[in-house]
């Protein structure tokens, strides 16, 4: 006896016979002939090697083995119904996993989207990885995540990006610095100052150094810092100047000021990036659609640049 050869169709016929206690009614409901139903029950009994139903005076009675099989079938079909519901939720983005890797600065912004999304989709897991651009780029190249957040997306054939938020970079100085009181500040005024910068590989540092090089300037005095918070605190303590995303600055910190450097514009944007050569999870697709529809409700409207429709359309 090998029960592995029992088909779901055989079990479906058997369950209907048990429920209706009628061969003819089973045939009608399942669109079969009565001889076919009888044949299926006979085949099932031969496979189990036990009588499952008995006919007495044209009435069907269920044996002990038949009742035990019926209970087992209920459990099995119930589990498959649950699995079908699970698949529907998975395909609808209600379950599953959306792995996101983001550059350091984006951690100040993305939770404002992730929080409302998670409240609407509590069964979606949202594991996050945070690093500098070089680290997130390495993860992208290895295909370790579903969605990547860059301020400068990779220029690769299998990379598809959608811009969603402006990321203005600003110069900050101690509140009592000589330049703090100047209404006109230029690159020439600041290049001789000590600058507190993130490590090489940081997108902010890359953009700043590229702007300097294009103008023929080189910084002579720099101090490497491990985080944007460290730069902000160090600038406020008088250690030097810094270049950071405006989004990392708390609104009521009076230990530093922003310098309006006239002859340089360090404008950038944040992008959601996916790999087109990899399957994107249903949860990731759900999150990107949520972001497209809710950017202005979740983030500061003045910085929103919602270009996610093309990205989402390309994923359909």
Language model segments and positions:
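A short LG(V/I)-centered, amphipathic sequence patch enriched
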Residues: 45-64
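Short beta-strand-centered segments that line the small-molecule binding cleft or hinge
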Residues: 4-5, 71, 90, 112-116, ...
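Beta-alpha-beta core module
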Residues: 156-163, 167, 229-277
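Alpha-helical linker/hinge and terminal dimerization helices associated
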Residues: 47-48, 69-91
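C-terminal effector-binding regulatory domain of bacterial HTH transcription factors
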Residues: 1-5, 120, 246-253, 264-316
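Short helix-boundary/capping micro-motifs
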Residues: 15-31
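Hydrophobic/proline-rich hinge and linker segments of small-molecule sensing/allosteric domains
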Residues: 160-200, 267-279, 292, 296
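N-terminal winged-helix
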Residues: 34-35, 39, 85, 91-121, ...
């Amino acid at each position: 006896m090998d029960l592995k050869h029992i088909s779901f169709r055989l079990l479906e016929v058997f369950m209907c016979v048990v429920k209706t206690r009628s061969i003819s009614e089973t045939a009608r409901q399942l669109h079969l002939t009565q001889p076919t139903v009888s044949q299926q029950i006979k085949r099932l009994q031969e496979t189990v090697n036990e009588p499952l139903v008995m006919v007495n005076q044209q009435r069907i009675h269920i044996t002990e083995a038949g009742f035990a099989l019926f209970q087992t079938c209920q459990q099995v079909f119930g589990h498959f119904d649950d699995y079908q519901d699970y698949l529907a939720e998975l395909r609808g983005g209600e379950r599953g996993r959306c792995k996101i890797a983001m550059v350091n600065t984006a951690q100040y912004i993305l939770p404002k989207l992730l929080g409302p999304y998670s409240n609407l989709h509590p069964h979606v897991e949202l594991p996050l990885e945070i690093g500098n651009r070089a680290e997130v780029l390495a993860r992208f190249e290895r295909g370790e995540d579903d969605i990547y957040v860059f301020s400068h997306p990779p220029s690769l054939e299998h990379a598809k990006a959608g811009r969603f938020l402006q990321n203005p970079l600003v110069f900050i100085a101690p509140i009592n610095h000589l330049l703090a009181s100047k209404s006109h500040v230029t690159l020439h005024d600041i290049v001789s100052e000590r600058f507190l910068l993130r490590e090489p590989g940081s997108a902010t540092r890359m953009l700043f150094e590229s702007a300097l090089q294009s103008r023929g300037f080189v910084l002579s005095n720099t101090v490497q810092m491990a985080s944007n918070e460290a730069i902000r605190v160090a600038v406020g303590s008088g250690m030097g100047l810094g270049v950071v995303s405006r989004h990392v600055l708390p609104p009521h910190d009076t230990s530093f000021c922003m310098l309006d450097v006239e002859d340089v514009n360090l404008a950038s944007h944040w992008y959601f990036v996916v790999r087109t050569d990899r399957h994107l999870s249903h949860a990731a697709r759900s999150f990107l659609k949520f972001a497209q529809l809710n950017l202005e409700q979740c983030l500061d409207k003045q910085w929103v640049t919602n270009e996610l429709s093309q990205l989402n359309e390309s994923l359909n």
